[in-house]
């Protein structure tokens, strides 16, 4: 299982696949933990867009815990808006 992340590196946009772990669903979308592209920390992103929910955690468990809290705090409406915005950015890339 992998997530495709949109990365801007040296003013160049590219899509980078990263291995995803422990997926969970919320608000009709699937999220999972993955290692950060350029460091050894853990992030949580949405599958279809790579929309980052939580970043730079030292453990996978903490990244998942913090991501779920963040998603609940932000609320369904705002999460869905952010995912739609991420989809538009991917189309433009």
Residue ranges, per PLM feature:
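Generic structural motif
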Residues: 3, 31-33, 44
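Short aromatic-glycine-(Arg/Gly/Cys) micro-motifs in beta-strand/loop hairpins
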Residues: 36-52
């Amino acid at each position: 299982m992998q997530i495709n992340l949109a990365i801007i590196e040296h003013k160049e946009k590219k899509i980078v696949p990263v291995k995803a772990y422990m997926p969970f669903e919320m608000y009709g979308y699937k999220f999972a933990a993955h290692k950060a592209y350029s460091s050894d920390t853990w992030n949580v992103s949405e599958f279809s867009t790579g929309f980052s929910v939580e970043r730079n955690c030292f453990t996978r468990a903490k990244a998942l815990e913090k991501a779920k809290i963040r998603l609940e705090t932000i609320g369904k409406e705002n999460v869905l808006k952010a995912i739609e915005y991420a989809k538009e950015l991917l189309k433009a890339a």
